[in-house]
């Protein structure tokens, strides 16, 4: 998010991007496109791989061309998910996650959409290798959630920052006058210290989003909200073994391992007389 903010500030100042940065952005785009094509190749045998890479924002695609392909738009992801649900040639969906999280906007809606989608087709997620914050919210909404052996998941929490530039501006000889209508319109502005009322309100908004986050995790992982808040939901990112011990994931496996498991499940389900017991045994293979 800081990187996106830096791009916006550079735009507003009319400063062009440095040539070295543009070269790096193009190189990153090639790498990510290669990874997406690899995922597309895996989309055989009725398994569609849906990538979720980079910072999560509601409309991250808007700055993709100038800040690098380092974001996922929840709107575009939802659209792609709907298309796969409607595609009769797709029997299972695998979400390939490598994301530090991002903005809260659009995440709850996407998580709800995944919950609805899994009632129609299996939706499996794998942290490959990071699913933190908003990305964990999304991943834990899947039917099953895995993490790679060297991967990490977590950062269940919400934060917001206020920066007070008043002293720096004063030292620079700059005085800012805000002209507004509405009692709280300029509350929390960066040109004056944050007062107690504004901080209390900002904290209440953070608490509201945290409540929604922990509720979604509890639903996705099938545990009480209290277990989330008192354990996995305290903001830390955990490695694979610790995450499995905390019931944050269903197993530890590479992307290829998960795809193999999904193919086995598809073959078993296609056989006459496939039983729930056999399906349960297959599900335990990665634990």
Cite the ranges covered by each PLM segment.
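N-terminal organellar transit peptides
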Residues: 1-287
């Amino acid at each position: 998010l800081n990187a996106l903010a830096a791009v916006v500030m550079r735009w507003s100042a009319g400063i062009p991007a440095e040539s070295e940065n543009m070269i790096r952005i193009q190189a990153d785009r090639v790498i990510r496109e290669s990874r997406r094509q690899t995922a597309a190749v895996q989309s055989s045998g009725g398994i569609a791989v849906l990538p979720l890479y980079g910072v999560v924002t509601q409309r991250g695609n808007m700055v993709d061309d100038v800040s690098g392909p380092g974001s996922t738009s929840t709107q575009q992801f939802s659209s792609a998910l709907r298309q796969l649900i409607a595609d009769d040639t797709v029997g299972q969906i695998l979400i390939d996650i490598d994301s530090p999280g991002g903005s809260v906007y659009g995440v709850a809606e996407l998580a709800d959409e995944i919950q609805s989608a899994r009632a129609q087709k299996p939706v499996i997620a794998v942290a490959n290798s990071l699913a933190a914050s908003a990305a964990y919210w999304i991943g834990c909404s899947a039917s099953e959630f895995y993490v790679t052996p060297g991967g990490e998941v977590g950062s269940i929490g919400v934060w917001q920052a206020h920066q007070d530039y008043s002293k720096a501006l004063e030292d620079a000889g700059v005085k800012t006058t805000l002209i507004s209508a509405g009692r709280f319109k300029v509350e929390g502005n960066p040109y004056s210290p944050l007062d107690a009322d504004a901080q209390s309100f900002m904290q209440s908004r953070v608490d509201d989003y945290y409540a929604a986050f922990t509720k979604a995790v509890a639903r996705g992982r099938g545990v009480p909200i209290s277990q989330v808040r008192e354990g996995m939901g305290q903001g830390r990112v955990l490695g694979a073994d610790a995450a499995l011990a905390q019931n944050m994931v269903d197993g530890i496996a590479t992307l290829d391992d998960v795809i193999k498991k999904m193919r086995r499940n598809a073959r078993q389900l296609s056989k006459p007389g496939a039983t729930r017991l056999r399906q349960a045994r297959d599900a335990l293979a990665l634990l």
